[in-house]
Amino acid sequence: MAFRKSNVYLSLVNSYTIDSPQPSSINYWWKMGSLLGLCLVIQIVTGIFMAMHYSSNIELAFSSVEHIMRDVHSGYILRYLHANGASFFFMVMFMHMAKGLYYGSYRSPRVTLWNVGVIIFILTIATAFLGYCCVYGQMSHWGATVITNLFSAIPFVGNDIVSWLWGGFSVSNPTIQRFFALHYLVPFIIAAMVIMHLMALHIHGSSNPLGITGNLDRIPMHSYFIFKDLVTVFLFMLILALFVFYSPNTLGHPDNYIPGNPLVTPASIVPEWYLLPFYAILRSIPDKLLGVITMFAAILVLLVLPFTDRSVVRGNTFKVLSKFFFFIFVFNFVLLGQIGACHVEVPYVLMGQIATFIYFAYFLIIVPVISTIENVLFYIGRVNK
């Protein structure tokens, strides 16, 4: 028996990355998982090195970031790689989730796999917000103020929760210090959840574009899919390097190069681009409490998909109606992101409300109705044949 199979530790690596049987029909959309793993490693490694030079004291936070940029050897690469790496992390994560929605990766028997993935998504959003506040630029300060103030919408205990989060009566030194501590901790929790994600994946194996069982036609991951992964890894690193070295601030906000000032409010308070769709959903509801509930529901609604999709066929590969409405959903999500970056004024308020309705309607109305209609059409086609 090969040593990689007989050794207790290497046998785990072997079963997950070398001899793991994969459906032969999977395409490049199944490469997003390896890219997300690469992104997580990049974020953790660059974050650890930046933490060696960062000071979480509110008086020194902004200056320490500039110290990393100006005085630390190759510090600007660390900072830009970490900042742009976060954006690319979310780009790939959105594509990974879109693949799951399109190909029905949330369907039984992979419900646990999907649920763990949603938890990872929530933790990643929290980590990104905490890290954005640590810079303590102008947008960081006011972003922290606005987002933490959302908890004040909770009846009776809301204001107490906000004061507890701040560690005082406003965003101050305890706030930044505890945000940095959590920002350092949560990525390791994400790494643990990723291991759970892989364990859940390993139980039933990967799905495939055809939506049928792949047990009849599987090939080992190495060397076929390992080298296929390397193609996307090299392409990803090339595109990331172009942003890091030639356009490092394109995905950021210029106001964050101004030190945080609680006495001056920015003209427009917006989060990073990857949180804009959920920010637009928050702003589309006039009532504060309902807006907060709707924003969190926009993420948690992903958990209901395994129960609302009643189709007898997994995935949208052979379903014309589902394909059409899926791409409507994608366009609507991009539109929400664009609306989130705009001021709260006519016509963006109404557009945001319509887009929010379409977003929730896709999960709660369109998917169950269309899947039922397609089931009837499949049945009629089978009988007539």
UniProtKB/Swiss-Prot annotation:
Role played: Component of the ubiquinol-cytochrome c reductase complex (complex III or cytochrome b-c1 complex) that is part of the mitochondrial respiratory chain. The b-c1 complex mediates electron transfer from ubiquinol to cytochrome c. Contributes to the generation of a proton gradient across the mitochondrial membrane that is then used for ATP synthesis.
Subcellular localization, as worded in the UniProt entry: Mitochondrion inner membrane
GO CC annotations, alphabetized: mitochondrial inner membrane; respiratory chain complex III
Residues involved in heme b b566 binding: H96, H197
Cofactors named for this entry: heme b
Provenance organism: Saccharomyces paradoxus
Protein name according to UniProt: Cytochrome b
Binding sites annotated in the UniProt record for a ubiquinone: H202
Record-linked Pfam families: Cytochrom_B_C (PF00032), Cytochrome_B (PF00033)
Similarity-based family: Belongs to the cytochrome b family.
Major place of residence: mitochondrion
Membrane-traversing stretches: 32-52, 76-98, 113-133, 179-199, 225-245, 289-309, 321-341, 348-368
Higher taxonomy: Eukaryota, Fungi, Dikarya, Ascomycota, Saccharomycotina
